[in-house]
Design a protein with these regions (language model features):
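Asparagine-centered strand-capping/turn motif at beta-strand->loop junctions
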Residues: 50-54
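Long, low-complexity ectodomains and other extracytoplasmic segments of secretory-pathway proteins
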Residues: 20-42, 49, 110-141
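Bacterial Sec-dependent N-terminal signal peptides
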Residues: 1-23
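Surface-exposed binding patches on compact interaction domains or structured appendages
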Residues: 55-83
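Short strand-edge motifs at loop-to-beta-strand transitions and within beta-strands
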Residues: 83-89
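Beta-strand-rich extracellular modules
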Residues: 92, 106-110
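Short, solvent-exposed loop/turn segments enriched in Ser/Thr/Gly
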Residues: 41-47, 94-102
């Protein structure tokens, strides 16, 4: 009877050790998306692709942005080992200014917090700068 209890106990310990070895790992194709120079009102949707390189299901529990002008969207479903997922980021391109924002991804991966970045510049080509107006007036004379 003691041998049976010992065998069951050792089996349970080895099972729990094996269960702890499995971990999800998140690997992004890139951690920065460059919008470049885009027009005011242009499509502000960009995608961050990632792969679960671990051996346990990956669950992205929360994605936040450093500004309300950037809205992230992601799947709540677990990403199985070896499979890919995506985080969609929509920037409000009605704001004419440089883009420098951080998107924070929280998951059950071995690195639970990952910072992604978007950068670029939104311009309004319908508005001419003072220098452009001055140059045009000199050419016309």
């Amino acid at each position: 009877m003691k041998k049976l209890i010992t065998i069951v106990f050792i089996g349970l310990i080895s099972f729990s050790i094996n269960a702890q070895d499995k971990v999800a790992k998140i690997k992004f194709k890139t951690d920065t998306v460059d919008y470049g120079t885009i027009e005011k009102g242009a499509d502000g949707l960009r995608i961050f692709e990632f792969t679960n390189t671990g051996d346990a299901p990956l669950i992205v529990s929360k994605v936040t942005s450093s500004c309300g002008c950037t809205v992230p969207k992601w799947s709540q479903e677990p990403i199985l080992p070896g499979k890919t997922g995506e985080i969609q980021v929509k920037y409000d391109t009605n704001r004419v200014n440089p883009i420098r924002k951080t998107i924070t991804v929280i998951s059950n991966a071995d690195t639970p917090t990952v910072a992604l970045k978007i950068k670029g510049e939104v311009i309004d080509s319908s508005k001419e700068s003072v220098l452009e107006k001055k140059d045009k007036s000199l050419v016309e004379k």
